């Protein structure tokens, strides 16, 4: 049925969530933009290759178990960093354990729809996040200081490795798990679009806060978003900025849970997808 088909635009949106999920946590300095752009390019190329092999992987039980085990690492890393972020910024009075439980419940509820419908919901989430991020950038455009811009140097390599370590496993695991090899172009488009937005917002952070100040902050992009406001309506611009990005990461985690459970359920979801009679 149509609802169980993974359309290319849904796939594009799902993979666009992956780079955008990184924005809240990345350090920002003069080399961040180049490191992010390079890492997302590598992930897009790796994702194309993985998607083209997805048909073989789907019919191999050992490969499915390897994917399931591999998906655990980016999944647990995402839940941990979301919990720490929320505890330090929003839920300062709550324990980290309660935040982990709350996030896990949200992720499992979304994963219960199955991978295809997770990708379907990724489309409005990606549009919401993209719109909010671009609006945040536009509102701070007049406050940017181009003097903070710097040319690429070898100092970008540590950040490149850091972003690649965080982004590549989820990108490759999800690309290998796609139901059709023809979706490889959607993988590339999604990672490229999300990567471009990630690089632009990191650039905005550096030009707005200055490279030295941004490098000292634990969540520089979140702090920079707090300077975007529309009168009294959005005085806490960082909240409007963070919510869609957290939704991006919950969507990413839900898709990884679908991959994790596939060897047990033989469907890409917690609940068995209905089949035509």
Model-derived features with residue positions:
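Hydrophobic, membrane-embedded alpha-helices of multi-pass small-molecule transporters
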Residues: 6-24, 36-47, 67-71, 75-78, ...
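Hydrophobic alpha-helical segments and their helix-loop junctions in multi-pass secondary transporters
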Residues: 7, 73-83, 127-152, 205-206
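Membrane-interface helix termini and inter-helical loops of multi-pass transporters
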Residues: 24-31, 82-91, 143-155
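Membrane-water interface regions at transmembrane-helix termini and the short interhelical loops
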Residues: 29-30, 53-55, 84-88, 104-125, ...
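Helix-boundary and loop/linker segments of multi-pass membrane transporters
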Residues: 29-30, 58-59, 151-153, 228-237
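Hydrophobic transmembrane alpha-helices that form the core helical bundles
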Residues: 54-93, 112, 245-268
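Membrane-interface helix-boundary motifs at transmembrane edges
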Residues: 55-62, 115-121, 179-190, 265-273
């Amino acid at each position: 049925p149509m609802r169980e088909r993974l359309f290319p635009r849904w796939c594009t949106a799902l993979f666009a969530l992956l780079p955008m999920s990184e924005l809240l946590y990345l350090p920002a300095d003069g080399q961040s933009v180049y490191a992010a752009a390079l890492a997302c390019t590598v992930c897009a190329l790796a994702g194309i290759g993985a998607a083209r092999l997805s048909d073989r992987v789907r019919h191999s039980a050992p490969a499915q178990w390897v994917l399931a085990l591999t998906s655990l690492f980016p999944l647990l890393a995402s839940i941990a960093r979301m919990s720490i972020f929320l505890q330090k910024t929003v839920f300062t009075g709550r324990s980290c354990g309660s935040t982990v439980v709350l996030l896990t419940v949200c992720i499992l509820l979304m994963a219960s729809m199955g991978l295809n419908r997770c990708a379907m919901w990724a489309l409005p989430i990606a549009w919401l996040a993209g719109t909010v991020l671009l609006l945040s950038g536009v509102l701070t455009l007049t406050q940017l200081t181009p003097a903070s811009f710097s040319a690429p140097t070898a100092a970008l390599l540590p950040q490149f490795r850091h972003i690649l370590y965080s982004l590549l496993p989820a990108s490759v695991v999800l690309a290998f798990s796609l139901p059709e090899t023809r979706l490889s172009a959607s993988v590339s488009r999604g990672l490229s679009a999300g990567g471009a937005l990630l690089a632009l917002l990191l650039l905005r952070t550096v030009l707005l806060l200055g490279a030295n100040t941004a490098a000292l902050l634990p969540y520089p992009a979140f702090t920079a978003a707090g300077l975007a406001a529309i009168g009294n309506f959005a005085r806490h611009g960082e909240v409007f900025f963070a919510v869609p990005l957290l939704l991006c990461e919950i969507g990413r985690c839900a898709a990884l849970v679908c991959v994790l459970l596939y060897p047990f359920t033989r469907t890409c979801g917690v609940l068995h997808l209905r089949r035509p009679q």
